[in-house]
Regions:
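Charged, alpha-helical interface segments at or near domain boundaries
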Residues: 2-158
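Residue-level recognition of well-ordered beta-strand positions that form the cores
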Residues: 9, 164, 178-180, 211-213
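Structural detector for short beta-strands of small beta-barrel domains
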Residues: 156-171
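Short beta-strand segments
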Residues: 159-161, 186-190, 223
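OB-fold (S1/OB) nucleic-acid-binding surfaces
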Residues: 170-191
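Short nucleic-acid-contacting surface segments enriched for D/E, G, S/T with interspersed K/R
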Residues: 194-211
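OB-fold/S1-family single-stranded nucleic acid-binding modules
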Residues: 215-241
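Extended, charge-rich, solvent-exposed interface segments
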Residues: 234-270
């Protein structure tokens, strides 16, 4: 199936969803797509998500979201990668408590929220679509508990991670800079002492090795690092992750090729 958008189903109970809850739910989905895109592509045109269709089916509110058409050197099909990664990641979390590809801790936390029933919204399902809806993935209790476990650090050790420094955020009054480092399809959040801010700014967008205290989840994945050592590394690519080069940077890549790549990726991890 050639993907053109994301279908979000909000399952209502006896109570209808309040407008504020409806918009909050959709905004969490939008932000999850943004988080994934920032891991997939360091720089480039970001998708603006618009409502393609809105309808009511029995007790479900069904919203279809598409990336707005814009003039850009980035192919429209490439902007659909976050949709595929979000649906695929939710399916991974139905099976096991691991951080899916292109997900960050914040993406995981958004899925926890989406999988938590609220008044008027008893559940949320996600699917890719192009005319016909693909396989729906229910954000159920299993997804919620696996997501919590995936983000929870269960082991601590000293070590290092290498990747491209992709995000810097100064936290007022806490004496630390929050960072994200990505390598291929993976991203790790971290904290760096605030007195290293200028050094971090010079390193932004470049490959670095960070040493410090690593926090791993039960699956052994590094989910956080408290940094005490920074080292610049030679740049081996510009802007896009290695997977991104396969999925969008090659001239002539098609929607079908992108979908097929993601299907193969799902099979290899399932």
């Amino acid at each position: 199936m050639v993907t053109t958008g994301l279908e979000v189903r909000l399952h209502q109970g006896r109570e209808r969803a309040e407008l504020s809850q409806f918009t909050r739910t959709l905004d969490e989905v939008r932000l999850a797509l943004r988080d994934i895109d920032q891991v997939y592509l360091l720089q480039g045109t970001r998708a603006t998500w618009v409502v393609d269709d809105l309808k009511h089916e029995r007790d479900d509110l069904v919203v279809r979201m598409q990336a707005r058409d814009v003039q850009s050197t980035r192919p429209a099909a490439d902007m659909q990668i976050p949709v595929l990664a979000l649906v695929d990641g939710a399916a991974v979390l139905q099976r096991q408590p691991t951080v899916p590809e292109y997900f960050t801790k914040s993406t995981i936390e958004r899925l926890v929220k989406l999988a938590t029933p609220t008044v008027g919204v008893q559940g949320v399902s996600l699917a890719a679509y192009n005319g016909k809806t693909g396989e729906l993935v229910e954000l159920d209790d299993v997804v919620r508990e696996n997501a919590k476990a995936a983000a929870y650090p269960s082991a601590i050790s000293w070590g290092s991670v290498t990747g491209r420094l992709s995000e810097l955020r100064t936290t007022e009054g806490r004496g630390a800079v929050r960072i994200t480092i990505r390598d291929g399809r993976r991203a790790v959040a971290g904290r760096v002492p605030q007195d290293r801010t200028e050094q971090l700014r010079e390193m932004w967008g470049h490959r670095v090795t960070l040493g410090g205290v690593l926090k791993r989840n039960a699956s052994g994945q590094v989910v956080h690092i408290d940094v005490d050592r920074l080292e610049a590394m030679p740049d081996s690519d510009i802007g896009r992750s290695p997977a991104g080069q396969l999925l969008g940077a090659v001239e002539g890549v098609t929607d079908k090729q992108i979908d097929e790549y993601l299907r193969r990726s799902r099979r290899s991890h399932g």
